[in-house]
């Protein structure tokens, strides 16, 4: 019975956009570029290591900032950022982290086999920071991003407006949603501590603004985010 409920909840959740509004839907896309070698996220978690050619990154001389999120429960994870693929997105994210914006905020939406979403000061999925940035993805006129929406990849949430992203971001749990490629700005990968992100799924959840069982009953709180 629990398995059936999870499946129903996942189907419901996937009918809503990863955004700061809850009444919008995805448009599907199957286009994605891949490179090799694969990127490995340390820590098995619930879905295994983050080893997939879909989210491989070309090595280059570009500096890759790293951001560490320490959770209130003591666990932590590190995100490596890729400004060569989404420069404005990375700059905005680093600025928010440096300003302490994410400290004390939560992951307000957690969906099994899909993603964990956070960074909303309202904790509802309807808020954000004061600054809006351009959506650096293909359907908004940018070059196709090689970071595919696979396990461990970090991407920006937005509303139906392509240029509405601000502070909300999401972390992918699985490789099953690459249709998001070209529609959302993927800009980083969890390189360590993915098991901590997986642990969010162990939290009891109730009905969220997306109409699915995605809202944690006990808040999943970010104690501190810092640039390493």
Predicted features by range, described:
Residues 1-19:
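Sec-dependent bacterial lipoprotein signal peptides
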Residues 16-228:
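Cyclophilin-like peptidyl-prolyl cis-trans isomerases
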């Amino acid at each position: 019975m629990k398995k059936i409920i999870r499946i129903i909840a996942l189907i419901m959740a996937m009918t809503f956009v990863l955004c700061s509004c809850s009444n919008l839907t995805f448009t599907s896309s199957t286009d994605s570029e891949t490179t090799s070698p694969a990127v490995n996220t340390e820590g098995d978690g619930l879905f295994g290591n983050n080893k997939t050619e879909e989210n491989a990154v070309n090595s280059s001389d570009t500096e890759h900032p790293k951001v560490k999120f320490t959770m209130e429960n003591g666990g932590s994870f590190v995100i490596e950022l890729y400004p060569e693929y989404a420069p404005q997105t990375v700059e905005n994210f680093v600025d928010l982290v440096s300003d302490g914006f994410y400290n004390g905020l939560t992951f307000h939406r957690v969906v099994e086999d899909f993603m964990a979403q956070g960074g909303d000061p309202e904790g509802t999925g309807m808020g954000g920071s004061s600054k809006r940035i351009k959506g650096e993805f293909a359907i908004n006129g940018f070059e196709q991003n090689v970071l595919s929406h696979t396990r461990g990849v970090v991407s920006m949430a937005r509303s139906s407006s392509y240029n509405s992203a601000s502070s909300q971001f999401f972390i992918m749990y699985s490789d099953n949603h690459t249709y998001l490629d070209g529609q959302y700005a993927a800009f980083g990968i969890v390189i360590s501590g993915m098991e901590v992100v997986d642990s969010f799924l162990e939290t009891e959840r109730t009905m969220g603004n997306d109409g699915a069982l995605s809202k944690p009953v006990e808040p999943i709180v970010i104690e501190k985010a810092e640039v390493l």
